A protein has these predicted regions:
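N-terminal helical capping/dimerization or prosegment-like subdomains
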Residues: 1-100, 327, 346
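An extended, acidic, His-containing surface patch that forms the Zn2+-binding/catalytic region
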Residues: 43, 81, 190-191, 248-327, ...
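Active-site metal-coordination/substrate-binding segment of hydrolases
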Residues: 82-153, 449
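A common structural junction motif
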Residues: 93, 240-245, 350-360
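A generic structural motif
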Residues: 123, 214-216, 334-342, 371
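Histidine/acidic-residue-rich, glycine-tolerant segments that coordinate divalent metal ions
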Residues: 146-228
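A short core secondary-structure module
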Residues: 166, 223-244
């Protein structure tokens, strides 16, 4: 008897909803996180639940000076003895609410509607700890065996994982050799099969501030004489992006697209249609970038893209007076293809934006984060077979692989340390999950299916193959 939605509701959902109610914002969004205590509350809740479910596990709340905490769970091998170690990764920090949620929904008030759970952090990535533990319980309940498993659940992923390297160093001896790495923070193009991520984009964030005046001036007096700080921002952005096509102009932000990516995206588009266009809640009449569904998949996963994600220095429209403002600040997000060097791209971005300021304006550019992307090595044939069995048995459909447009710094960091280790990045951030946006949603049926798929993988991997 596999893990069911009833099992989830009995053993997981109540605690998951308590987690969802905690505003455990990542430190980038809550600089006073040590004072607010929300990350600590989330950590304690998860640790307590894991101890109640796996009493034989070594559960520790790891702490390093000046770092967000990390949840360590070590579960010894069960059944047939083998020396393999599987590391399962997730995170408990959250994105901010972003804005007003739909009627009846709120970021930190979990709402169940049918088999959907709405709350910030439900799918990204609160479910991960519960899924990993439930899968291990399911293996044991069904009489199976599993290798030694280590759960690493961090608290700074949504800030670019600045604390993770320090923990990997501190825990390296305790972790030991890693034979399989599973990340539960990735996405899916549909809920009818197990999706394994073949690549992730990198990310560079910078803040640009342009100052033109010591104090604001009446626009009737200063306009036409003093250049607008916003216009200078526009000029600077034109150095980085073609304003008409959206193409990124920095050579360091590009890499060659492998032939297999082109063929794989064509295959996905032929089977699922224009999935990228289908999932975007665009306004009527908007023309999307890209020639077709396959091209849009490539653009989302293997091409750079620039977005303005923050703006300061301007009042709300209702408060706007006829004033030439002193300055404008924007935060840029530059997504990078999987094989681009984030550090090199970040340095190039800062350099291009800083040199020869238009009109002699005061320009300050700050690189706030840089995380390289990741491309998976080809899965070993036996592992791919196990995953396909898990997908068909749990979801109903065959295993599928796709690239993702987001960034998980952990995969690049572990990939550098363990280049020969197979990596599986998967998750239930599927259609309408709205991670990072309003109305974030966890599809509970998909979570159940993933738990069963994960249980199959753990019980058939390693010494029990």
């Amino acid at each position: 008897m596999p893990f069911t939605l009833h099992d989830l509701d009995e053993n997981v959902t109540p605690t998951l909803e308590r987690y969802c109610a905690i505003p455990a914002l990542s430190p980038h969004f809550d600089p006073d996180w040590t004072t607010s205590g929300h990350l600590e509350s989330a950590l304690q809740l998860l640790a307590g639940w894991v101890r109640s479910r796996l009493p034989e596990a070594d559960v520790r709340e790891e702490r390093l000076e000046g770092r967000t905490p990390l949840l360590w769970v070590e579960v010894p091998a069960h059944g047939e003895a083998n020396s393999d170690t599987v590391v399962l990764y997730g995170h408990f920090d959250k994105q901010p609410p972003l804005g007003e949620w739909s009627e009846g929904l709120a970021p930190f008030t979990p709402v169940r509607r049918g088999n959907r759970l709405y709350a910030r952090g439900a799918v990204d990535d609160g479910y991960a700890t519960f899924a990993a533990v439930s899968a291990l319980e399911e293996v044991r309940r069904s009489g199976g065996t599993h290798p030694r498993c280590v759960l690493l659940i961090e608290g700074s992923e949504e800030s670019g994982s600045p604390d993770l390297e320090a923990y990997l160093d501190a825990l390296a001896e305790r972790i030991g050799r890693i034979d399989l790495m599973i990340c539960l923070d990735s996405g899916a193009l549909s809920y009818d099969r197990l999706w394994v991520t073949s690549s992730l984009r990198g990310l560079v964030n910078v803040d640009i501030t342009v100052r033109v005046l010591e104090r604001a001036q009446h626009s009737g007096t200063a306009s036409g004489v003093v250049p607008s700080s916003f216009r200078i921002i526009r000029q600077l952005l034109d150095r980085v992006e073609d304003a008409t096509s959206g193409e990124v102009l920095l050579p360091e932000a590009h890499c060659a697209v492998p032939d297999w990516v082109e063929s794989a995206t064509r295959g996905v588009a032929e089977e699922f249609g224009d999935v990228v266009a289908q999932e975007m809640p665009v306004v009527e009449g908007l023309e999307l970038m890209g020639r077709d569904g396959a091209d849009r998949l490539v653009r989302r996963t293997w091409k750079p893209a620039l977005s303005v994600i923050g703006l300061a220095g301007a009042p709300e429209p209702r408060q706007a007076g006829n004033v030439l403002r002193t300055s404008t600040t924007v935060t840029l997000s530059l997504r990078l293809p999987p094989l681009a060097d984030a550090r090199a791209a970040g340095e190039a971005l800062v350099r291009v934006l800083s040199v020869d300021p238009p009109s002699g304006a005061e320009v300050e550019v700050t690189l706030t984060s840089a995380a390289s992307g990741w491309a998976a090595r080809e899965l070993p044939e036996d592992l791919r077979r196990i995953l396909d069995e898990a997908s068909r048995g749990s979801f109903g459909g065959p295993l599928a692989l796709t690239g993702e447009g987001g960034t998980i710094p952990f995969l690049f960091q572990l990939g550098q340390r363990f280049p020969e280790t197979p990596f599986i990045a998967t998750g239930v951030l599927g259609p309408e999950s709205n991670a990072h946006g309003i109305d974030e949603m966890l599809n509970l049926e998909a979570a159940v299916n993933l738990i069963n798929a994960l249980a199959h993988l753990l019980s058939h991997y390693g010494g029990s193959q």
